[in-house]
Amino acid sequence: MSIQIFNTLKREKEPFKPLKDGEVKMYVCGPTVYNYIHIGNARPIIVFDTVRRYFTYRGYDVKFVSNFTDVDDKLIRAANELKLTVPEVADRFIGAYFDDVDQLNVAKATVNPRVTENMDEIIQLISTLIEKGYAYESAGDVYFRTKKFKDYGKLSGQELSELQHGARVEYNERKQDELDFTLWKAAKPGEIFWESPFGNGRPGWHIECSALAKKYLGDTIDIHAGGQDLVFPHHEDEIAQSEAATGKTFANYWMHNAFLNIDGEKMSKSLGNFITLHDVLKDNDPNVIRFFMLSVHYRKPITLNDAILEDAKNGLERLMIAYQNIDHRIQTDDGEYVEEAHEDEWLEQLTELKQAFEDDMDDDFNTANAITTFHELAKRANIYLAKETVSINVLREFLSMMRLFAEVLGLKLENTQTDSLDDSEVEALIEERLQARNERNFARADEIRDILKEKNIILEDTAQGTRFRRG
C-alpha cells in the first residue's frame, strides 16, 4: 500500500507521488514570534513532525522547511510594550520556541528561515508580480490583483462572487478592488522598514511564505501544510502569488490539521481559555503532551482537559512499562533463556503487527490507529513475558519493534521522571530486602516492598531468586 494523503485541494485522499523519487519537499507555516506559542500551535508542529518522521522511515529524504515571521504588526506592538527592538523580541521568542518544541521531541527542520533574513527574495517576488501585471503600487503599498488570478478560491472552495461582499474583506481606499490583498506595506513613522523599489516598508504576511518556499524548495513543492485556519486567506493567497509569478503548480498536496479545543470550546483570548505551550509544559510531561496530540487523527478536532491528559498519561505509561519490562528481562536474564517451541509463531505475530502499524500510517498518517496497534504490541509483550520459557530472539524483536514505533511517533519509552528508580537502584533495594529477610527483619523487608510498590515496581519471588517488573 502506498502512502495516502487527504489533499485539501482535491478534497479526497490521493496516493502520494513525489516530484522526485525518494525525496519529499515539505513546507509548514511557522509561528509569528511575538510571544510564546499557544498550545493549539503545538498540534501542527507535532503532527507534521510525525508525518516527516514517517516519510523518513519509509526511506524518503525529507527537506523540511518551516519559517519564522519575525516582523509584523504584532511584533512591533510587542516591542513597544516590552521596550525592546523588533529583532530583540523575535530573538527572545525564537529561543523560547526551540526550548519548548525540543521538549516535545520535535526534530530540527532542514532550515527555519526568518523573514528578515530573506528580504531580497521577497522584494524580487513582488517585483515579478508587478512586471506580470498581477500586482500594483498604491501610495507606497503594493497589492495583488486577486481577480486577475482565475483559479483564486480553488483551495478553500470559495467563488470570487461569494467573496465580493464577504465579512473577511477589509475596505481600503488604496486598493483598486476590495478583494486585493497586501504584498508590501508602506512604512509608518518610527516603524522598522526595508528599502525597496516601491519605497520603504515591510512585506505582507502571505508573500513571505511564497518567497521562502520558492527559495529553499523550488517553484513546485510536494507538500504544504498548516492548521485549518490557514486555508483561507493565507494559503489561498500563497497559491495565487506563487502560481501567478512562476506559471507552475505551487504545491501538489495540501495538508491541514483541525483545531484544538479547551473543554470543548475553541481556544481564544476572548473566552479566557488561551493557554501557551510554555505554561502547559510547566505542569505536564512533554512526552504525554505529544502522545495526547497523536491520539486523535489530525483532521479531527481534539479537546484538551485534565481528564483527557490523565488518560493520555495512563496510555503512555502502559507502553513504557511494557518496554521497560522487556528491556529489563533481556538485560538481567540472559543466561536463562531456552529455545522456545513457538518462537516462529510469535515472530510472525510481530511481523503482522508491524504491517498493521504501517497500514495505519499509510492511511493519511492515522496516528490514532497506529497507537492502538502499539498498545496491541505492548499487550502481547506482556503476555509473552508471563510465559515460563521465553526466547531471546522474540524478546529482542519485541524491543526492536517498540523502539521502531516510538521513533516514528516521536515518543520516548525510557522513564524520564526524576522520582523514578533505575534498574541498579531497584536491584540494590532488592538486595537490601533479601538481607533484611535473612536477618529476620521482616518489618524492613515489607517496608522496602512498599517503597518499590509506590514506584510501580512489582516483586516476584521465584525459586531462582527475586525478579521485578514495572507495572
Swiss-Prot record:
One of its GO terms (molecular function) is ATP binding. A motif ('KMSKS' region) lies at residues 266-270. It comes from the Bacteria. It is an enzyme of class 6 (ligase). Binds 1 zinc ion per subunit. Belongs to the class-I aminoacyl-tRNA synthetase family. NCBIfam families: cysS. This is Cysteine--tRNA ligase. It comes from Listeria monocytogenes serotype 4a (strain HCC23). The gene is cysS.
